[in-house]
Amino acid sequence: MAKKKKEEKPREYTRRQLTHFQKQKRRQRIIFISGISVIVAIVVIVSLGWYMADYRPLHRTVIKVGDAKFDAAYYIDTLKKYGQSNTGFSLDQLDMYLPNMIVQNELIKQGAEPLGITISDADIKQSLESGNQSVSAASIDISRAEQLATRIKDEYIGIQKVPVSDNQVHIMALMVESESVAGEVREKILNGDNFTTLVADYAKDSYSKTLNGDFGLHPRRILDEELNATVPLDYAFGADVGSVSPPLADNTTYKTIGYWLINVTDRPSDNESTVKALYLSTNEQALDIKARLEAGDNLTALADQYSQYSDSKNKHGEMGVITKPTENTTTVTTAFDGYIFDPNTELGKWSDPIPDTLSTQGGYWLVQVVEKEINAKLTDDDRSSLINMVYSDWLNELYTQHASEIDYSLLTSDIREWAIARAEKEIAQAGG
């Protein structure tokens, strides 16, 4: 029969030994906890650094459009997207327009919804992926805005806002500086002189010069854009074919000519002149005001009412001491400087009218109605232009309606500089 294994008696420890073991375990536990605490502290510090350096700055809101908020990460991503598709521009240049583009994309989205025109994120994502393009919130919004713009023009404006046909007029037109010149040119037109030649000789508006006076057959909205003046069009759409207008006064359109009246009162040094001056709309007006000044009329009152050069007007005609400019530069214009620094200019005397090319407001139109068509079909180019104009009007109206909801105030110059630098770095890293 097998012997029973003798059970060992548990080892007994003295009170002193037990106290020692307990202290040892406590030390081990403290060391362990301390180690864990150090690790946790390191993780917290690293995480806090990441939070402060990356997460928090990237996730702060920089632009608001109503309830829609756009953070710095979105701003940077949008800047990168536009930078990659507009390689001819630096990120600094694109950043000038970026806040408005972000707002515009959101307004297009909001404005399209009441028209029943929407595109889901999923559809945009699929479109981007099929084109091997990266997908992000920014790229989705950019692509959506582009697609919505096309659909709004095709499905809304092109159908409901812009007709297929409209009244159209073909006009020849030019603006001259004064009523007397207009009367002279009108006689030449009636006598059969070539209109294009007359434009080259007499026209003072940039629009007539650009098109040689021939604005073609178009609806009014197109001609409004080409002429940038209502006076000639009011006449043309109410006149018969073949009509030549009388001189039509226009006090708002600008022309590329004006006339100086200058009085050099003193020369403090060889390179300085003390000057009084007015810049006036026409030669006739300049002659009249010169006579009034020489008769003792008040310079301040005349400059305030008639001068069309801002420095002259703001200083009430007293332009003060002007220093001769360095070579290849001017203080005002070549014509102005040439007179005031000419040693032969007589002091204290008003000059004759000196023509110059600074723009002035006001002139007289002559219009010849070449052709008129009632409710004629629009050309494809005109209709496309009209659709784009109406779309621009629609977008401007959205800005007006939502002006109080648009907030750029959080997008500081420091944030923009930081965003540009970060975007440049990320683009460089991606390219490397």
Task: Please annotate each region the language model reported.
Residues 5-36, 44-58, 83, 95, ...:
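PPIase-associated folding chaperone regions across multiple families
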Residues 50-142:
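N-terminal targeting/tethering segments
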Residues 75, 195-196, 299-300:
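Conserved hydrophobic/aromatic "anchor" residues
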Residues 132-138, 196, 205-213, 309-316:
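Secretory-pathway/luminal and periplasmic proteins that interact with or process carbohydrate-rich
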Residues 213-227, 232, 317-325:
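N-terminal entry motif of extracellular EGF-like repeats
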